[in-house]
């Protein structure tokens, strides 16, 4: 089991903020760090894990290795985890940083 916090503000864009060894929160902007849910899902799949559940806001993703309980615990799609009204409202905050440097995965 792997639990990963993501930035739902990034929406379904498969992006990450480039690593900065000197980063200290809040940095240039409170949400300018980390990775999107879509980016983390790509990483997890590449490592042999599947998304099985998130918290209600879609921030905390819980992944399970693909060789464990595959029939009992099915994979869910990232898009289905980003439907809470607060999560949808948070997408607006990405507008403030949308033109900053990101890496697509």
What are the language-model segments listed below?
Residues 13-105:
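Rossmann-like AdoMet/SAM-dependent catalytic core
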């Amino acid at each position: 089991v792997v639990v990963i916090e993501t930035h739902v503000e990034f929406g379904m864009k498969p992006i990450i903020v480039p690593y900065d060894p000197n980063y200290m929160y809040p940095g240039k902007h409170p949400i300018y760090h980390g990775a999107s849910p879509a980016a983390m899902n790509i990483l997890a799949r590449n490592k042999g894990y599947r998304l099985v559940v998130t918290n209600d806001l879609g921030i905390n993703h819980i992944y399970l290795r693909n060789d464990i309980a595959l029939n009992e615990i099915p994979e869910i799609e990232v898009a289905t985890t980003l439907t809470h009204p607060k999560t949808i409202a948070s997408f607006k905050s990405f507008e403030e940083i949308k033109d900053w440097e990101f890496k697509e995965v």
